[in-house]
């Protein structure tokens, strides 16, 4: 079944279902843990999870019947909303939720303050009798919980109470180990169209037939939840103030396909203009842009959401590793709660960052960017794109507004004087939805407290003591340990500042990452990819078949003549100079003119052979046997890495240019599949906000192009919109994607009609149920689907003409560090006890005393000569690394060390002197915290008369064994690509930059650029850690917050290339036999590798497999196993195996006193032409670097070096075969760890 065929992705079927189920207490607790609930509402907003809220084989996309015609039905494609609504008999679920006070009243106050529209139920309509409906499907109403899932196209009908349940088509399905009855819901348009002039039937919130009035599913509580959770939030994103008008427009848009008509502009209010000093022309430009992007986003939300999607892996609840690994129900609840604690880092970023997508919905005109209009007083499109930006809208929430006729309307709310961020601001951005506000408060009660040092924790303590009076505004003293007032007291120092002046900032969004990426130090520069000719590489099938979606993704110069500013992508968002965009004649190789991947692969292979890293996981496996061993291993490693860097410099000089290196682009992709975040309704809410932000930002390009050519000449903005919107819509639909940022895909159907047996809707409206064969037509043969957005970063700063360069990247002096703080410090800490047994001093103090020449004589350091050589080596390596360190990031594992050293040396040898930027992934971890800072552990509202009594009670909790509360912190990943390889949920600041094409092209392109988090309360690891005014690392480093979902919510795919245990042993044995360690017999190392994971002596067939079929070698190993068996050896450690099996060799070596036969003449080159190039086979470990074919002088281990004059011919001979190893993924493996 083709994944690209629309009829396969979206089968014919209903787009809404009712589920009737009997929930046990365990299932209710699971739902309460994963859902959004509030004590004031009977509606629970649950995630859309297969195996929990819907059946395991639930299809997320359907072609649903919408209209009838003679002999058949017309179907439209839609996908289900990523949430489910439980609304009947939910007391058992709500009882498990935390009480956060009177959240309902908080939301009402926020509506009054900000003049938001409130939901009003239909006064003359009787709600559906749910007890009768339960009885109709054979269920007991008092024991049955009812919930609904609905498609995006039908949610307005659900709000209006017009969906018709067909109980005759009820089926039994299984949900979380129990049975449930599923009943389909059909839209009223199928039953209204009974006249010959079917188009005369009105589609409206208020107009309905008698049949729909009597049979429609109308639950006011469900309608109210949709009103606030979905529509009020959408209105905020679109700067639209009338949710009911938006619902009406969405209803008609889905049925009548009115995406190309103006729907919202006549009712739009223009907010946030009064605080800006704008000329008449600037105000017109801003109003028109506001209206156009609002209308386009509303129209294309229907286009993109009413499309066909694949279910995401993270929505398969029954297959979550977190679920399958749970031993019992309590263990499952603990794991789910810990997952939510991990997510608290992302929720905190959304709340505490002033540039969060929750707040970035105001459109402003930044005059400083647009005070240079062209002749005649008009503005160019590029000027408008620089001037019109999205900013934080909290400060303008209470301003007067303009209407469609550009008249000022007075603000109808009740603004307060105090503009500090408070609970009502949170209620505002939550759309005044109580369940959503309550969900945020749960997280605020569990994030870490950041004390300022002025009042410490006394503010929270004093608040809890004051709660004994029962005067809490939030809860009246009933639940002060968990109410929203206490939550805001806890995080008061982390709350965002409401900005007074608008400014351009990136927008913080939270979505799931995609696997493919180019985020290593130089990104896509020098990357090559094996692709099939039919795929066309990055412009063909990349990340899940997305054009331009491959890991190269790049940026820089476009070889096809597309646009370039040195950072953005070329045409199709593919790659430019650094990623190449080229494919060989055979269609097999795509990528750059040079092959950096080949060099990294060689380094990786070397590390494997020398047993420095695990060949599968990339974890460090180096074990220091002593100081001399340490020096020997890392001297050889450093030399090998430096030689590879020199070889790559030669290759780049021959085949590339400095501009290509300077244009290196890092890129990663963010998933826009709505079901990637369906496991948490709060994230689904943030997803919709993010999609609207993306669409409107891209829509600005189309809007400004028409505004420049068609000025506003009428009094009504909507009239101008009516004249031009159809053309604007068509232009946006053809140019919105494939411009470097937003990527969509057309899902097509090969046929527009089919035949099947469906309900006879006309007979059913007359009271007769019958299933008849009929023709089924599809309204559209193709639908666009959201795929992803691409975010880029350019690590190498390039100053403009006449610019001396940014002070943030300037590298004026090289700091000197002691070895424990240098590039090998992580190894010194790890092996301190082994290098200096019985030392008595911790690692850092030991090296401080060594570097200060103050080490006491009674500290045992071993042989003085060996110690001196060891210290000299470390000092030299540390100084050499610092001299070439352009990253300014200390390595923390062997992989990061060799990768950093390679790139540092390459860049320095190539002439780069300043610091470069870097990407860092901060992954969430859980740590224990102080009981006193987490009042929710009290279990009841506090009743303390003094801070001392509170402190005594907290001490009693610890004594009683109450577990310490957990909170999420973050740790920097050694390799940022591991964030994407583990399918992480990421929170990242993104700015959408627009730029014109080259060669005077009128095309405007865009790219997403990673930015910064605004505010000091987002996460302590993001704050400026140094008080020094010269430390600008925070300006060079870009961060993303991540929570790994692989092995937690996403089961790792086990494809054909899965490695079994025997394969892993074989790999390690072969590496041991190929190792060049002269201190140990390779066969003993192979024996150790086999026995390290086995408890018994292996069979001869197994050994033959491990040595790749070499019978002589297998026989020799079997002799050693037999010797172990005869002597009864049970200790299979490497030291003991060497003592037992390698004793004779050790005695011979010791007896020789270190003297060896001089066999160097046997390996001398026979002629001048036999010199080995660095790029081909690499230098022998004993060769002098000064004699390499690239003509570099590399004095000693510290490796300086400079180019010789006229070295071109020499270089031509020094790169032999360097590009022959292209292909493969090529990057060093990321370290694995669990959530």
From Swiss-Prot:
Q: Which GO terms describe its cellular component?
A: nuclear viral factory
What is the role of this chain? Plays several crucial roles in viral infection. Participates in the opening of the viral DNA origin to initiate replication by interacting with the origin-binding protein. May disrupt loops, hairpins and other secondary structures present on ssDNA to reduce and eliminate pausing of viral DNA polymerase at specific sites during elongation. Promotes viral DNA recombination by performing strand-transfer, characterized by the ability to transfer a DNA strand from a linear duplex to a complementary single-stranded DNA circle. Can also catalyze the renaturation of complementary single strands.
Family, per entry: Belongs to the herpesviridae major DNA-binding protein family.
Q: Where is this motif: Required for filament formation?
A: 846-847
Q: Which GO terms fall under biological process for this protein?
A: DNA replication
Keywords on record: DNA replication, DNA-binding, Host nucleus
Where is composition skewed (Gly residues) in this entry?
545-584, 1214-1226
Q: What's the subunit arrangement here?
A: Homooligomers. Forms double-helical filaments necessary for the formation of replication compartments within the host nucleus. Interacts with the origin-binding protein. Interacts with the helicase primase complex; this interaction stimulates primer synthesis activity of the helicase-primase complex. Interacts with the DNA polymerase. Interacts with the alkaline exonuclease; this interaction increases its nuclease processivity.
From the UniProt record, which GO molecular function terms apply? single-stranded DNA binding
Q: Short name of one Pfam family for this protein?
A: Viral_DNA_bp
Question: What SUPFAM superfamilies would the database entry show?
Answer: Viral ssDNA binding protein
Q: Which gene encodes it?
A: DBP
Q: Where is this region: Disordered?
A: 536-584, 1214-1235
Q: What is the lineage of its organism?
A: Viruses, Duplodnaviria, Heunggongvirae, Peploviricota, Herviviricetes
The primary site where this protein sits is host cell
Record's protein name: Major DNA-binding protein
Task: Please name the InterPro entries in this protein's record.
Answer: DBP_sf, Viral_ssDBP_head, Viral_ssDNA-bd
Task: Name the source organism.
Answer: Human cytomegalovirus (strain Merlin) (HHV-5)
Tell me which domain of life the UniProt entry assigns to the organism this sequence originates from: Viruses
